[in-house]
Each structure stands twice: as C-alpha cells, then as structure tokens.
C-alpha cells in the first residue's frame, strides 16, 4: 500500500506495520492509524509518527532513553488491558518532540509517552501522574552529551 504524505511524499508501507491507536492521540482523537517512519542513518535518533488517516499530520518522536537513560514509569492495569501487554520487552516507547525555529529550544514531552505494543501494533499516549517529568523538557544538551559519550 502507499500514502502520499505532506512531509515525505509517497511512502510504500505494509498494512502489518500500521499502529492502531484506539483512542487516537490527545488533540487528534479522530486519527487512529499511524506508521513509524525511520531515517536509516545511524546517527539519527528521531523518527516520525505519520498519520495515515490524515497524511498532513506527522509527529517527530524519539526514544527518551537516548537522551535520558533512566527514563522509567509505572505501567498501570488500564494500559496493560488497552494494549494487551503480555511482555514489557515488546514495548516501544517514544516521546513527541517539538523542534522550533530556534533549535536550541527543542523539547520533548516526557509527561505523555507514546507506548506501542510491537507484538500487536496497538498504541496509546499515556499521561503520567509523575511530577518528575515535564511536558516541555529541553533535550538539546542531553542529546549532545549522549552522542559525545557514545
């Protein structure tokens, strides 16, 4: 199958790769089907969560453990049921990144990670009840440090 996206042009994809968000994503509740688009360069930590239902919508995402290795949170029973989680090793964790014109002000939403069960391709954006994580967590310096230590 293929879609014609605003940011990437025509993309070929396998229907088995579609990630289904039953409730959509907060603010985009009418969008349920997404793809993870990866830049194949090793030095590129960012990916894109591309909506299939509205191909003008794509979110920049990153695994938060790239820049914050100790990023952890509790997985509650509601999330286990919603994503049919049997093994946490099958979970993919991403956070949405905002990259403004002034790149040094780049932030990630650590308060609301996107959790995907890779076993069944079900996804959900969880809202954490945790004051430690910010909605607008600055990440540029942490990314620089992560890559300088690699």
Swiss-Prot record:
Record's signal peptide: none
Protein localization: Cytoplasm
GO cellular component: cytoplasm
GO terms (BP aspect): bacterial-type flagellum assembly; regulation of translation
Keyword Nuclease recorded: no
Keywords annotated in UniProt: Bacterial flagellum biogenesis, Chaperone, Cytoplasm, Translation regulation
NCBIfam families xref list: PRK13285.1-1
Family that this chain belongs to: Belongs to the FliW family.
Function: Acts as an anti-CsrA protein, binds CsrA and prevents it from repressing translation of its target genes, one of which is flagellin. Binds to flagellin and participates in the assembly of the flagellum.
Subunit structure: Interacts with translational regulator CsrA and flagellin(s).
Listed name of the protein: Flagellar assembly factor FliW
Organism whose genome encodes this protein: Thermoanaerobacter pseudethanolicus (strain ATCC 33223 / 39E)
């Amino acid at each position: 199958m293929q879609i014609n996206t605003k940011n990437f042009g025509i993309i070929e994809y396998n229907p088995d790769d579609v990630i289904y968000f039953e409730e959509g994503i907060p603010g985009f509740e009418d969008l349920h089907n997404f793809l993870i688009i990866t830049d194949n360069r090793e030095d590129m930590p960012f990916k894109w969560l591309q909506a299939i239902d509205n191909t003008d919508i794509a979110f920049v995402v990153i695994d938060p453990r790239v820049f914050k290795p100790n990023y952890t949170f509790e997985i509650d029973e509601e999330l286990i049921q919603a994503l049919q989680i049997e093994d946490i090793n099958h979970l993919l964790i991403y956070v949405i990144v905002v990259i403004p014109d002034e790149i040094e002000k780049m932030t990630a939403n650590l308060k609301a990670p996107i959790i995907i069960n890779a076993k069944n391709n079900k996804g959900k954006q969880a809202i954490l009840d945790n004051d430690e994580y910010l909605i607008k967590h600055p990440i540029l310096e942490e990314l620089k440090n992560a890559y300088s230590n690699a």
